Amino acid sequence: FDLGNRIEDQVVDRLKQMENIKVSALDKDGKQYRCSFLAGHFAGSTDGVVKNVDPKNPEEVMLLEVKSANNNRFNELQQGESYEQWSSNYAIQIQCYMAALNLSRTLVVVYNKNDSGLYTEIIDIREGVLDEMKQKARQIILARTPPESPYSSTDYRIKKFMSAKEQAVYNLEQLPDNVNCRNCKHSEPILEGDGGWRCNKFNKPIDEAKQRAGCEQHIWLS
């Protein structure tokens, strides 16, 4: 992930060096542009925004999305129909960001980690995606049992990116090592105001330190 962040920073720096494109990677407070919903339980940060991309509408502000990929994945992207077809997860991500920031289009830049090649595409917003994802996120956040896995135990994402221990937990063959309030039946996310979590066993809010520590009254979500 650290390598990916460095690559994203390098791509942003290269865009800034271009005379015609104006890039803003940070908001007026000097922080990443952040989109937050459901009292912070459904949130994410963007790579920034850009202007002067489309010569027909130079003042249009677009979302900037930077990703990196190995050579095989990069070739799949180039040979495919579009960025959104290449990765449905990334597609949903930018659709949510565009709606949250009231933007109509995204400039996508994908960096090839093998040969430094670049793929670019401009993507239009699709109405209704954010509302659909907020509804889905609410259902997951408030769920009292773990959601069903979208991937089988033999899926390459499970085999490649998870340790044996993580695979066992993911496949419900073993409990996690760490007890905390987030995996306890007594806890409940607060979706109003500043958000946070509360304990229904002791009827009080739980700060982050206490969430991580858990307690002897812990009961696993199952």
Can you annotate each of these PLM segments?
Residues 1-222:
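Accessory terminal regions of nucleic-acid processing enzymes
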